[in-house]
Amino acid sequence: MSKQVRVRFAPSPTGALHIGGVRTALFNYLFAKKHNGVFYLRIEDTDQNRFVPGAEKYILEALKWLGISPDETIGKNEKFGPYRQSERKHLYKQYADLLINSGWAYYAFDTSESLDTLRKITEAAGNTFIYNHTVRETLDNSLTNSPEKVAERIANGEDYVIRFKTPVNETLHLKDIIRGDIKFETNLLDDKVLFKSDGMPTYHLANIVDDHLMETSHVIRGEEWLPSMPLHVLLYRAFGWEAPEFAHLPLILKPVGNGKLSKRDGEKLGFPVFPLQWKTNEGTSLGYKENGFFPETVINFLAMLGWNDGTQQEIFSLEELVQKFDLNRIHKAGAKFDPEKNKWFNHQYLVKKEDSTLAELFLPILASKGIVTNLDYTTKVVALVKERAHFVNELWDLSDYFFIAPTSYDEKATKNWKEETPELMKQLIVVLNGIEDFTSLNIETIVKDWMTQNEIGMGKVMQPFRLSLVGKMMGPHLFDIIEMIGKKETINRIEKAIATL
């Protein structure tokens, strides 16, 4: 690309970062890294009424956990700082005044009460009230007041807003990287408020000013901002600035039904919609981290929501995503969220991890259950059972018999315990006692030779043998279990089963 790529993630600190916002951040990050550009984070906190303490810190921590921290943000490489809009508000009034002076904006003194009244009258007549070119020259603003009167009212401290003066009778031909050519009729647009009576800019003005001053090359954001695109392009024209390129991402859709994924969907169907835990007065919402997902899992499944590389490949490292990412391969249609597929992704990453790494994550779970063990033994256990796990916290249910003897036996499996079983198990104990080299392959060879020589059917021994050691008909290769728990423990468990069953 001819100019340096600079892209931003610009959330509002109004609560926990939703998974849809995380995907927007991810796609910006991938695009920046693909083109050796800069990914920066800007906090858009102009709406102080919706500001939530702790939300800004949460956003930064979530991006850090996911491994997609910004190159520039608050307190980090502040080349174009400040990166909080509330600390830049002195700038916005200057630019609002520029628009006033160039005729692209005007002061409006209409009270909310007068506009509400006008809105009700219009709706009663079966129409929709829009503050635009059809009514602006009949309302209380600087287009209908003399310059002297306007100056007097402002000097007297009267409340006002600054509205954009949308051009009339124009068709805007705009281009979106994902959606292609788009047309907008300016006559259908309203005169948006750019500067509020509280002295703060609206999103539209602050966004355009900051994107220009921070040299943003591409705006990659959710499709909910597509209706704002014509206003934003017109603002660039009004200022005489070159507009960035735009790419509006498809929605993340509900797993069932129609519409955009929401926090309520997660609560109803039992899956997280936040990257990290979020606490409010109403309660605590666990995030993907607390639910046992690896950060690379979240990155991977979010990347596949609305994008693919044109192949059948589904598992991508962050480095591979950077290499293959292309905005032109993002779909226009919304992407359905699939909680079960996300678990599959986590399983793929779990089985790829080093056994010792998983063991280190598993040890605190074992300690919480009063199990005293070591990393070496736990690593061997993990190697035998991880293929069946989606999450680290599932390892206990898959491997508890490696650490404690069964306290009960699966009722269905006890049907394999026949009248002759106790005698066969006693003979098996004798065989096991005679084995010196107590390793999996050697134990298996000797036990199977004994069964063959005595013409004992495999099922008559192996099923009750597994039931004695595990308590159920599951688990890895039986002789691997035997080697792990050792001769003494193996025999003790068989004797307990004989006495119990």
Swiss-Prot record:
InterPro entries: aa-tRNA-synth_I_cd-bd, aa-tRNA-synth_I_codon-bd_sub2, aa-tRNA-synth_I_CS, aa_tRNA-synth_I_cd-bd_sf, Glu-tRNA-ligase_bac/mito, Glu/Gln-tRNA-synth, Glu/Gln-tRNA-synth_Ib_cat-dom, GluQ/Sye. A motif ('KMSKS' region) lies at residues 260-264. Belongs to the class-I aminoacyl-tRNA synthetase family. Glutamate--tRNA ligase type 1 subfamily. Keywords: Aminoacyl-tRNA synthetase, ATP-binding, Cytoplasm, Ligase, Nucleotide-binding, Protein biosynthesis. Monomer. ATP binds at residue 263. One of its GO terms (biological process) is glutamyl-tRNA aminoacylation. It comes from Flavobacterium psychrophilum (strain ATCC 49511 / DSM 21280 / CIP 103535 / JIP02/86). CDD domains: GluRS_core. A motif ('HIGH' region) lies at residues 11-21. This is Glutamate--tRNA ligase. Its EC number is 6.1.1.17. GO terms for cellular component: cytosol. Transmembrane segments: none annotated. GO terms for molecular function: ATP binding; glutamate-tRNA ligase activity; tRNA binding; zinc ion binding.
